[in-house]
Amino acid sequence: MKIMRKTHPLAKMVNHAFIDLPMPMNISGWWNFGSLIGMCLIIQIATGLFLAMHYTADTLTAFSSVTHICRDVNYGWLIRNMHANGASLFFICLYLHIGRGIYYGSYLYKETWNIGILLLFTVMATAFMGYVLPWGQMSFWGATVIANLLPAIPYIGPDLVEWIWGGFSVDKATLTRFFAFHFILPFIVAALALVHLLFLHETGSNNPLGIPSNCDKIPSHPYYTFKELLGVIMLLGLYLSIVLFFPDLLGDPDNYTPANPLNTPPHIKPEWYFLFAYAILRSIPNKLGGVIALVLSILVLALFPFLHTSNQGSLTFRPISQFIFWILVSDLFILTWIGGQPVEPPFILIGQIASILYFFIILILFPVAGLIEDKILKW
């Protein structure tokens, strides 16, 4: 087996990528989330494939086909709950993975980081379109609200929104194309994930100290495979607990009502993992400004490598930057809370302050803190 692992063309690729891959000795549990995201993607593709066998992408039958899956298909309720909650788990792992990248300076590997941002956009698009498919009230009105942002784009906006709609409003054509895109995008995500890994293996993994570790590496298997197995077991425990005991904990009750274009829900909001971006969108009174802020809330991550002013890669020995990082995390929690609240005082003002603080921390405070810390250390 050892000889085949190192000689067979396909086995050799797997060997170099996962088995004999040199890894830094000192990486912590925060480095587990890459493999956990991969596991979430596999679960989502597998459960999604089984759901697609019974789902019908038609406005008249979409809602009843989801009901049919839950009531009549063998273990359909389980597959549907796994798929719906798997998305939440996916985003929890994604956000923790990005947070680790910011904290430990992994953004300095520019190619890997930029592919990661592209992956985030693709996963967000996939999740948004998936939320539309059950054709409940929040599915329909969520699609309507987000699609109505597109006309704000100068010149091409009105044509773009009609092209996405496939008509003059969110209707059958919209649902059909959203289903087609939702089906194909996870495979594009899987391909991009391989490119992400390819770039990562060009430079090697980062480590908590943020310094080169070429002289002190160990093979990925068996050391890190067993370490990651612990993360997998813990995550599966949390996942199955939610799926089997609290399947509707992270969903919206409005989505159990069939879509009705004549009845607007009192409060339209996306899934919890988009609420921070939704809060930033709502905090700007101008439509185009809101759309720009929404895109920049994610795209600002691409500026991290250029805003890095410190001579140290990681935040491990940078207390001022650590403090600012945790303020940023707190700010994101506040934005998530505000995104789920109605548009009325005092939530409007809190959302605007939190949105300004979000960009201020990333664009101003982080670079300034890096310079101050270097000055204190006389570097």
Curated annotation (Swiss-Prot):
Membrane topology: Multi-pass membrane protein
Pfam family, one: Cytochrom_B_C
Cofactor binding, note field: Binds 2 heme b groups non-covalently.
Highest taxon of the lineage: Eukaryota
Function text: Component of the ubiquinol-cytochrome c reductase complex (complex III or cytochrome b-c1 complex) that is part of the mitochondrial respiratory chain. The b-c1 complex mediates electron transfer from ubiquinol to cytochrome c. Contributes to the generation of a proton gradient across the mitochondrial membrane that is then used for ATP synthesis.
Misc. comment: Heme 1 (or BL or b562) is low-potential and absorbs at about 562 nm, and heme 2 (or BH or b566) is high-potential and absorbs at about 566 nm.
Binding partners and assembly: The cytochrome bc1 complex contains 11 subunits: 3 respiratory subunits (MT-CYB, CYC1 and UQCRFS1), 2 core proteins (UQCRC1 and UQCRC2) and 6 low-molecular weight proteins (UQCRH/QCR6, UQCRB/QCR7, UQCRQ/QCR8, UQCR10/QCR9, UQCR11/QCR10 and a cleavage product of UQCRFS1). This cytochrome bc1 complex then forms a dimer.
Record's protein name: Cytochrome b
Lineage, uppermost ranks: Eukaryota, Metazoa, Chordata, Craniata, Vertebrata
Gene: MT-CYB
